[in-house]
UniProtKB/Swiss-Prot annotation:
Catalytic activity entry: a beta-D-galactosyl-(1->4)-N-acetyl-beta-D-glucosaminyl derivative + GDP-beta-L-fucose = an alpha-L-Fuc-(1->2)-beta-D-Gal-(1->4)-beta-D-GlcNAc derivative + GDP + H(+); a ganglioside GA1 + GDP-beta-L-fucose = a ganglioside Fuc-GA1 + GDP + H(+); a beta-D-Gal-(1->3)-beta-D-GlcNAc-(1->3)-beta-D-Gal-(1->4)-beta-D-Glc-(1<->1')-Cer(d18:1(4E)) + GDP-beta-L-fucose = alpha-L-fucosyl-(1->2)- beta-D-galactosyl-(1->3)-N-acetyl-beta-D-glucosaminyl-(1->3)-beta-D-galactosyl-(1->4)-beta-D-glucosyl-(1<->1')-N-acylsphing-4-enine + GDP + H(+); a neolactoside nLc4Cer(d18:1(4E)) + GDP-beta-L-fucose = a neolactoside IV(2)-alpha-Fuc-nLc4Cer(d18:1(4E)) + GDP + H(+)
Signal peptide: none
E.C. number(s) listed in UniProt: 2.4.1.69, 2.4.1.344
GO biological process: fucosylation; lipid metabolic process; olfactory bulb development; oligosaccharide biosynthetic process; positive regulation of cell-matrix adhesion; positive regulation of endothelial cell migration; positive regulation of endothelial cell-matrix adhesion via fibronectin; positive regulation of sprouting angiogenesis
Name of the encoding gene: Fut1
Protein name: Galactoside alpha-(1,2)-fucosyltransferase 1
Amino acid sequence: MWTPSRKQLCLAFLSVCVLSAGSFFFHLNGGNFFQNALTFSVLCPDYHLLKSPVAMVCLPYPSNASSGSPSCPEQSLLSGTWTITPGGRFGNQMGQYATLLALAQLNGRRAFIQPEMHTTLAPVFRISLPVLDPEVDSLTPWQHLVLHDWMSEEYSHLEDPFLKLSGFPCSWTFFHHLREQIRREFTLHDHLREDAQRLLSGLRIGPAGIRPRTYVGVHVRRGDYLEVMPNRWKGVVGDRAYLQKAMDWFRARHKDPIFVVTSNGMRWCLENIDTSHGDVVFAGNGQEGTPGKDFALLTQCNHTIMTIGTFGFWAAYLAGGDTVYLANFTLPDSEFLKIFRPKAAFLPEWVGINADLSPLQAQFDPWETDSLFRLA
């Protein structure tokens, strides 16, 4: 009777181990082992000497309530890796996050955010997208795509497995079909929500101390827009007359409303917003570096008045209810209209109140600015 030698037994055992390991990696990688080197790259650090690595390694963030993001992504059937270059401030990066999530899902890709975006958004929201390791980012063979600020058919058929998006997308046309998921991603941390609700619950209207029935968040965008809008884009920001009309719109439709004003130009608000009704409170701190408090206040209101900017858009989008926005805030020949489409920026059910462009029209009227031509 034949009896295998010790050497033959060892070789047989080794073969079984190799086959088992190969089967494990094959199934773990969704049957796409050779096209996607994720598992092999993680297990073999020197693999990048042979092939550009595509492993996505999470940063070692602690998984606690303040971080918002899980320390590593769950296994999924999605392939490839997409990310987006963070840019701008809080509202801009919210738009970039939501657009990345929506486009990656639409094209069957995995989405990862940059550490800078995590630093901006995670202190405020319970975001779930994992973070891309900087070293992996630097070694990945990215394709690049600059997005414009509205959804296009071409964005539904993007075939690049390793794609780095850029631009400042913040249009509901990218992600509105995922509204409930977006709202979950932008869920406030408990302490921010509770602080906002505590402040709102203590507000009263007028000397009689009437308890408000409706809370209207008001975001007045000023700051750098005071220079950028007229000088670069031939546009205006929300003025006193616009805010008065917007508040009157709500007063005509809701009993006992209270207006909760936040702004990065609170001094102007104090001097220009009519408080004679006793229904206006200046509640925000206007700190652009720590926007969580102001944003939480706005989203916990029932309705929104916004002027311009992505911060106000997101406050209105997450608060729900009625939204009044500043419409037609640039001259018709503004370069801004080449990168901004109002129908893609404001939801159809939102209510627009036209801006007063007369100061701009006088500024750019050749009869007013060219005295020689006027005399001729």
